[in-house]
Amino acid sequence: MDVDVEEAALEQVAALLQRPDQLEKLPELKKRADRKKLAVEAMLRTGVQGQLEGIRTAIAHLQTASDDITAISQGVHDIRERLGPFPQLKEKLRELRDANARHGQYAAAMENLKHIFNLQTTLQEIRDALDDEKSGGNLLLAHKHIMDLERARDELLAEVHKMSGTNTEKEQMLLVNFFKGVDSVVAELSKNMWFILGRTLEMVKGNEQGGGPQQVVTCLRIVEREERIDKFYMEARSKNSSAFVPPGRPRNWKEKALRSLEKTVSNRVDGNQLEDRSLNKAWLARYLEVCKNVIMDDLQLAKVAIPCFPPDWQIYDRYVHMYHTSVCRRLREVASEHLEKSELVQLMSWIKFYASEDMLGHPKLRINAQAILQDSPVLSRSTLNQLCDQFVEMSRDDLKLWLKNTVSHETHDWYKNLRPSEDNHGYFYTDLPNTVFGMLKDTVTLAKEVSVEVIPSIINLTIQEFNELAGKYRDAFTAYKTDYFAERSKYQEFTSNIIAIANNLHTCIESTEKYKQQIRLSMEGEQNAAAAMTTPLASGRRTAVRQQQLIENMDALNTKWSNAASVAVNYLREEVITDIAPSLVEIFSKKWLTGSAALETVCMTISDYYHDHKHLRPVTRSTLLMDLQFRIVSEYLKAIETKRVSLNSYEERALAGKRMKADVVRLDNLYAEFATSSDMADQLPLLTSIVAAAGDVISLKDKSLLSLEATSFARKFPNCPAELLSAVIATRDDISGSEARSLASEVLQHVQFHPKDQIFDQLFALRQQENSERLPNLGMANMFKADFMSMLKRDA
């Protein structure tokens, strides 16, 4: 240890004397070290002195403690000696103690002798008071007598309870049997009280004879007294498990009073159903309406009854809770039964109304209806989902039946040769679109009564059923068309009926598009709310559907309507083509070349049919007229390609070119006449220019200019097939087939990058089809949609 101290001292000195100039401070450093040493020594002396003082004090305390222990031991010994005689004293005083107990019992008996001797008289007075209750009420007097008798009985029983002996239980039974009449009048009193409290609202309203609200207050005062007595004995029992508690306690009359009120409320809700489905189809609506009136009236009376009840009862909140609980229980029972569609709608509509400001949320009632329904909804989410699914399935069955009957009725009218109705624009129509989409509107209106969540499912199932309807409708008018072509004279109104069908389908497309726009707008409006929603409202429902899926299904439905409309227009075209087919065969033939009136017959036939076709909607009419124009112009091209006529001289070629141009003028005039109708917003595109251009190529006199004329033809129709152009050129008598093909290929190669008119693509494709094949409808679905959107823009 000395070595460590020495090393530490050397290190300290080395740290202080690191530079030569620090040696000058050596005397000062020595003085500082001496002062520090003296201070440390003084601190050590002080510490040692304090320890010594503490030791002296401890020794003195130990001496004092020893003396105290000796004194206490002596005192305890003296007390033990003095208490020695006490056990013998207890035995000597036993008789005195027993005498004191008997004296207490006798004193209690003497004090209650009046009640004991007058027990039967008092019981009769109580019964008389209870009997008088109907004419004014003496419930307080009856209860006073009962309390007197109970006090006498309980004091005697308490004295017996204090005794410890073999006869204690026997004496208790003797007293209980003696006072058993008290229990009967207590039961009678409580029965009267529960009757009065059960009619609290009628009492408050003043519809009952007697004291009215005063009787209610009397009953509540008695209940409060009994509650205080129960509390006294229960607190005594909680402090001492062997404490005396009178028989029949606690009575819990407050709980029984509330149970009486709850039973009355339950009866008020359940007892309003006076009929069932067998007696009245509207039984549920009538029952719910009565419930609504009863609940509103009773809750307003409950507010009036608040002053009659103690504040801690919170009677108004209890009434609200009891009515809500009873309503929930009853409606759950109704929901579990097999409900018809109208009953289901009435139930769901009433549940929505239940929380509205017209009922539970009425300002006068001052009830937080939303909080109540959040804590205890009328129907569970699973039950609501189940009811919504039931409604969807019921609606599906109804729609199937309605749509089937609608198509059946429509078909029946066709075969009766009834002319369709005309609207204010002169367009034929039937009631099918209004009926069909009226069903959708009515079903959606009902769905709103059920739940907003079920509307997408209803619209979706309606779309599905409309898809089936479109197919069945198409099959029905296809069968009608087959019967017509089998015996045309039998069905005079075929054309007008098919026109009405096409117009109906156009109306269906418009209506579907309107609903689709409404759904799209609702999707945009609800996008933010849907993004913030953690759980979909329709989660757990079997028939739930996304709105985007609705849009896609509606597009598919519109395609189905459009296809059916195309078929209807095709049947109108087929009817015309059947009549003009013999004349079409004569076009660009020897007979035509020599002056046949084939085209004039065609034009007159189309013009004659136009008297019916003008009752078509403009878009559909344009499609039909364009179909017919396709058919006529394609007949020229087909005749040229099949070499229906051989032109052996310039004179014949010139005559053919002249006839072709004359036919073009006739067709153009005919279609110009059609386009002048007030409802034809746009001119009908004409295809006849290709016939005139072909006539120019055929009738050209100077062969040296043929290449130039062919180039001009190719520039006008750059998408013309090489086979068709070579056939036009080869119709001339001064050029061979190989030369025609070579020239056609050459000129078309020069114009391959020129802008092309797509309408001629359809024409060129059509020329290859047989007469019986169906013509394309120019993308009718797209035309209908574009026309509808343009009408919307014009309206805006």
From Swiss-Prot:
One of its GO terms (cellular component) is exocyst. Keywords: Coiled coil, Exocytosis, Protein transport, Transport. One of its GO terms (molecular function) is SNARE binding. Residues 87-174 form a coiled coil. It comes from the Eukaryota. GO terms for biological process: exocyst localization; exocytosis; protein transport; vesicle tethering involved in exocytosis. Belongs to the SEC6 family. The exocyst complex is composed of sec-3/exoc1, sec-5/exoc2, sec-6/exoc3, sec-8/exoc4, sec-10/exoc5, sec-15/exoc6, exo-70/exoc7 and exo-84/exoc8. Component of the exocyst complex involved in the docking of exocytic vesicles with fusion sites on the plasma membrane. This is Exocyst complex component 3. The gene is sec-6.
